[in-house]
Design a protein with these regions (language model features):
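C-terminal target-recognition/interaction regions appended to catalytic cores
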Residues: 145-287
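Class I S-adenosyl-L-methionine
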Residues: 1-198
Length: 287
């Protein structure tokens, strides 16, 4: 959904045109799709109005199902919206779902990195997490010289290294440590961060993420920022794909350059429930 959500925004035409064609030319019992959570908000109302009109004109009833991945057993904070065109004037009642999410650290540990699996041999980020200057400051200065594994065991929630630093000290002190250890460029960034925060501004925090309970949406910088919970490395492509619940034998073409492709899809388990509900509807098993 285009952020503007204007009913005539060309970026939203694919939903309208696909619905017009499928409902008028193919006339299925149900036609459904997936979109951003904005579709179920006030911002998406103009698009929803157009889709409802198409439904009415073709003898269908339109409905929306908004959900979050945490309800589908996935330890990822990620809301999604599914939309449906049901032939006739009624819609089925979906079964409620609330599968407790697992711990993200345990999800990563459970992945088997097979030496014969190409996706298990490719790291999303070939650097070492503990070589990151901010994380090194935490391990050596704040924590007194512990290992990545020890820090990961200590924390109780997924931790961004910059958030952790801000909870324990200020960037002007971090800048001093950075200069003492030869990280002059990082020291200058710390100086800017200190003054910006002091003035009431905000900064971007895209540093190393140490996984524990759950993570935010697995998009953007996340695939290259999440560390393994035990080993001082970043995730393999196989481990990254597992966070989207992709099949264990799934292979990506040009995986290193295509990391964002896995992120731009709805997690498999999130889509699994509405798919199961559509199947039950077609089998006459829903009210």
């Amino acid at each position: 959904l285009s952020p503007s959500a204007s009913s005539n925004n060309p970026a939203n035409d694919w939903m309208v045109k696909s619905a017009e064609y499928v409902l008028s030319e193919m006339s299925p019992k149900v036609f459904w799709g997936e979109n951003a959570p904005r579709l179920a908000s006030k911002m998406g109302a103009p698009v929803v109005k157009r889709l409802r009109k198409i439904a009415d004109e073709n003898g269908y009833t339109f409905s929306i199902f908004k959900t979050k991945s945490l309800l589908h057993g996935l330890s990822q904070v990620r809301d999604r919206t599914f939309y449906f065109f049901w032939k006739g004037d009624t819609v089925p009642l979906f079964e409620y779902i609330n599968i407790p999410p697992t711990m993200i650290a345990d999800d990563i540990r459970a992945v088997v990195n097979d030496k014969n699996d190409p996706m298990s041999q490719i790291l999303c980020n070939e650097k070492k997490p503990s070589d990151d200057p901010y994380y090194k400051f935490i391990l050596d200065s704040i924590e007194g010289g512990i290992t990545h594994k020890e820090f990961a065991a200590k924390i109780t929630k997924t931790t961004n290294v910059q958030d952790y630093i801000e909870e324990h000290t200020t960037y002007n002190k971090v800048a001093e440590w950075m200069r003492e250890h030869g990280y002059d460029n990082v020291a200058r960034k710390c100086d800017r961060a200190y003054h910006k925060l002091k003035a009431g501004g905000n900064i971007m925090r895209k540093g190393v993420e140490i996984p524990k309970d759950k993570i935010g949406a697995f998009v953007g910088h996340m695939p290259t920022s999440i560390a393994h919970p035990d080993e001082d490395r970043f995730l393999t492509v196989r481990e990254a794909m597992s966070l989207m619940k992709l099949p264990n034998d799934y292979q990506m073409i040009n995986a290193k350059r295509s990391l964002n492709h896995m992120c731009q899809n709805v997690p498999v388990t999130t889509a699994e429930h509405p798919a199961a509900m559509v199947k039950k509807y077609l089998e006459g098993k829903l009210d």
